[in-house]
Design a protein with these regions (language model features):
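Glycine-rich phosphate/pyrophosphate-handling loop used in enzymes and phosphotransfer proteins
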Residues: 1-247
């Protein structure tokens, strides 16, 4: 299946014009060199960010490499790595992928991650990478899970298993934009679960959770909670776009 997909992509690249997902200029690649350079120069990876939630740190927070929120509230995930700010050059492309079903854009988004983040994170010894799941209703409506479509194209160590079937979501919740962290955490409680057949194989393991957007961190914290409940040792978040303040 992957071979067939790569073949189709290769043929299409020689037949159809390609526009950069960020600047929309026609060229040969899904994201152009200029936009990759812009992204790399402004990527959150080069900023002093909270090791736990990935948000840029205030001056007074720099010594501990942890933001005041994480220090006070102690999220259950262990680390977070983010590619760029939510309001950066990839925001429009991500919106078009999700809401206009521009599925071809996953190639450019994955390429951006691989170009900038994979070299930094290639030594991560995680056992699994799991996408944040959509509800069955949302998956049926959209037709794909954007987090999985990006995650499965990310370069990883050979022993890291990718799967969209282990972590699942019960049902769709109302959009939580505008709600504070406490309200979001309550609304999403018990929303996710692990397919029971994988419980034993996850015990004592290190798991990466991939999400397209991180705002308050409530979703990722709830996922970390259920993973650690069944015995996962370490939970790391990989996030495409991060809001730079809590919403």
């Amino acid at each position: 299946m992957q071979f067939l997909e790569n073949l189709i992509q290769s043929i299409s690249a020689h037949i159809l014009p390609t526009a950069c997902i960020a600047c929309q200029r026609f060229q040969d690649e899904s994201i152009c060199t200029s936009c990759l350079n812009t992204l790399e120069n402004n990527s959150l990876i080069y900023y002093e960010c909270c090791y736990q939630c990935g948000i840029p740190l205030q001056v007074q927070e720099l010594p501990n490499k942890q933001c005041s929120y994480c220090k006070q509230c102690s999220p259950l995930f262990d680390e977070t790595y983010c590619l760029d700010r939510y309001d950066g050059i990839l925001q429009t492309a991500l919106h078009q992928l999700k809401y206009q079903k521009r599925i071809a854009f996953v190639h450019g988004l994955a390429k951006a991650w691989n170009h900038i983040q994979s070299a930094q994170l290639v030594s991560d010894d995680a056992d699994y990478i799991l996408p944040v799941p959509l509800s069955p209703e949302k998956l049926l409506t959209r037709g794909f899970n954007q987090s999985w479509e990006i995650a499965r194209r990310i370069r990883l160590n050979m022993h890291t298993h990718k799967s969209p079937f282990i972590l699942k979501r019960h049902h769709h919740s109302n959009h939580q934009a505008g709600s504070n962290m406490v309200t979001r955490q309550v609304a999403i409680r018990e929303m996710f679960y692990i397919d029971a057949q994988y419980n034993k194989s996850l015990q004592g393991k290190s798991v990466i959770i991939f999400d397209d957007v991180m705002t308050s961190g409530a979703t990722l914290n709830e996922i970390a909670r259920i993973l650690k409940t069944i015995g996962v040792e370490r939970v790391i978040n990989w996030v495409l776009l991060r809001t730079t303040r809590f919403i």
